[in-house]
Regions:
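Flexible, glycine/proline-enriched loop segments at strand-loop-helix junctions
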Residues: 84-92, 118-128, 153, 157, ...
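Glycine-rich nucleotide/cofactor/substrate-binding loop typically near the N-terminus or early
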Residues: 23-111, 172, 181-184, 191, ...
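Acidic, glycine-rich active-site loops and adjacent beta-strand->loop/helix elements
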Residues: 9-10, 38-39, 127-129, 152-159, ...
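N-terminal glycine-rich phosphate/adenylate-binding segment common to multiple enzyme folds
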Residues: 103-106, 114-117, 124
């Protein structure tokens, strides 16, 4: 089974995760074509940095103007449906998983306001996050990734609304090993993608045969360990009885495997 492992070291955004997949070999021109086919602006920024100590790829979708004052759960569902309707209707349900986790975390962080009415801008969510999610799925599709795993990591308690939301979202990420990562550095939407899309949070071991390693960074000039996410592409094999307690679905398609 072709799999992707994600390892977070510090700062984490959706764009960093996309940048890592470009570093993995997904052509930017392919991503632009997917945006165009979905009726979305093609004005993203991407830049490799092969001379840095950590060779990583920078990617960013700049914010656009003239946005509504509030951004609520219903808006995410509506916009996402429009994005997926043209070329990838099968991805609509995948987005729902992310949004459900996101709004639940936002509700916990923002005065327990119900998830369906909380303003998601208060925790840093924007419409551009949906475009980045679409490109992340498109990149996985290009690489023929069948399932996604995240390496466990420990986190600190959040202080701001965004940090508290990230902490509330990352219920499966908790590990007692290693230096805790500040939730203030983890974008809630990126946290929701890890939590909503990962088949499991588990360490890489002998069952995973890595083929390629790539990095995405939030810095175009100085990628470091703290502002870089690592992504490992390879093959996951397991002959054990059960890894997960549920029948796994791979990006909206039944994998046919009880793991």
């Amino acid at each position: 089974m072709k799999a992707l492992f994600i390892r977070c070291y510090g700062k984490l955004t959706v764009d960093m995760m996309v940048g890592g997949l470009i570093d993995m070999g997904v052509p930017p021109v392919y991503l632009k074509s997917r945006l165009k086919d979905a009726g979305l602006p093609e004005n993203f920024i991407e830049k490799p940095n092969p001379k840095a100590q950590v060779s990583a790829h920078y990617f960013h979708i700049p914010p656009s103007g003239n946005k509504p004052l509030l951004l609520k759960e219903a808006d995410l569902f509506r916009i996402w449906k429009e994005i997926c309707s043209k070329e990838a209707p099968e991805w609509e349900e995948i987005g729902w998983k992310v949004f459900s986790v996101l709004t639940a975390g936002a509700s916990d962080a923002v005065d327990d306001i119900p998830g369906n009415i909380v303003d998601l801008r208060r925790i840093g969510v924007s419409e551009e996050n949906l475009s980045s999610l679409y490109l992340f799925l498109a990149a996985l599709d290009y690489l023929e990734v069948e399932t996604l795993f995240t390496c466990p990591f420990s986190i600190t308690a959040g202080k701001t609304e965004a940090g508290k939301a990230a902490a509330a979202i990352l219920t499966d990420a908790v590990s007692t090993v290693g230096t805790p990562i500040s939730t203030e550095e983890i974008a809630p939407f990126a946290a929701a993608m890890l939590e909503g899309l990962s088949a499991s949070f588990m360490p890489m071991d002998s069952r995973f045969l890595a083929d390629r390693t790539a990095y995405g960074s939030s810095s175009a000039e100085k990628p470091t360990g703290d502002n870089t996410v690592a992504e490992y592409l390879g093959y996951f094999t397991d002959r054990g009885e059960s890894i997960f307690s549920r029948h796994m679905k791979v990006f909206g398609m039944d994998s046919g495997l009880d793991l």
